[in-house]
């Protein structure tokens, strides 16, 4: 992450929408990220004296990214939380647009934007992720929308994780949602805990989507899908889809689509 961490931090600091708290988590990086972050924080404190800045490095790798998510929720003091992953980036208008969607509907608990993908050298690979997300070619993501959480899960999120990258998303820390419980449960998943967490949160509110690619998701060219990883992913997908069936009112047709999707995997 050392190659991208400064760009990531700056992409947060340079937002057109004001931020009040910056929490940087490091999960025992094996590179020089900690030293780079410490030096950057000294600079931040001089330039942004009113910004609350926390740096929390782990002494031992947690082994599960969702433990870090939980720490972010535990440590943050604001009403909204943006988990900005270390190797991603974004438009400086990202937060401005995402936060507007909360203002349009006070029941929105998750607000996100479309994402483009880029490589290690910031070369754009895909202008958006609609081809990945909209597997049944519904056209759902061609326009911005606000959906009731249950409807979104029963018609879209039940099939696949339609929120491809957590960096594209801001959560409202609604006091009626037991984020702590759901994140502890999410840690039992190695690959699909984000999907599990989203469907749990959406039991309690609505979701908003901005069609513009305001989030920049970095794809690592050396990432490899191993057979064992594929098998684990399939196992977790089946588990999450079963949980959705138990907690949501899926139509007969949608349940059949779930079965067909499992077979194609």
Model segments located where?
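Glycine-rich, basic loop-to-helix element that forms the pyrophosphate-binding segment
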Residues: 57-76
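Donor nucleotide-sugar binding loop of glycosyltransferases
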Residues: 1-4, 29
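Short aromatic/hydrophobic "clamp" motif used to bind/position activated sugar donors
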Residues: 81
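Conserved nucleotide-sugar donor-binding catalytic segment
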Residues: 90, 132-230
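The conserved acidic donor/metal-binding loop of glycosyltransferases
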Residues: 85-89, 114
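Conserved donor NDP-sugar-binding/catalytic core segment of glycosyltransferases
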Residues: 93-135
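Non-catalytic, C-terminal membrane-associated alpha-helical segments of glycosyltransferases
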Residues: 229-237, 255-265
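Acidic donor-binding segment of Leloir-type glycosyltransferases
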Residues: 10-57
């Amino acid at each position: 992450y050392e190659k991208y961490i400064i760009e990531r931090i700056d992409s947060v600091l340079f937002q057109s929408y004001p931020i009040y708290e910056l929490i940087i988590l490091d999960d025992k990086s094996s590179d020089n990220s900690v030293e780079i972050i410490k030096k950057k924080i000294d600079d931040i404190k001089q330039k942004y004296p009113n910004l609350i800045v926390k740096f929390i490095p782990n002494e031992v790798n947690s082994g599960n990214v969702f433990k870090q998510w939980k720490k972010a929720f535990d440590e943050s003091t604001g009403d909204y939380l943006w988990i900005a992953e270390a190797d991603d980036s974004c438009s400086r208008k990202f937060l401005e647009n995402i936060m507007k969607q909360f203002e349009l509907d006070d029941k929105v608990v998750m607000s996100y934007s479309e994402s483009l993908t880029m490589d290690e050298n910031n070369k754009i690979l895909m202008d958006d992720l609609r081809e990945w997300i909209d597997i049944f070619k519904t056209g759902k993501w061609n326009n911005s929308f606000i959906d009731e959480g249950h409807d979104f899960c029963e018609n879209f999120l039940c099939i696949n994780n339609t929120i491809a990258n957590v960096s594209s998303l801001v959560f409202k820390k609604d006091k009626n949602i037991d984020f702590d419980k759901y994140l502890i449960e999410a840690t039992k998943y190695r690959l699909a805990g984000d999907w599990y967490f989203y469907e749990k949160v959406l039991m309690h509110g609505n979701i908003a989507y901005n069609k513009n690619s305001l989030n920049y998701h970095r794809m690592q060219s050396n990432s490899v899908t191993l057979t064992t990883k594929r098998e684990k992913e399939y196992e977790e997908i089946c588990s999450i889809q079963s949980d959705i069936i138990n907690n949501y009112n899926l139509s007969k047709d949608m349940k059949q689509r779930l079965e067909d999707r499992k077979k194609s995997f």
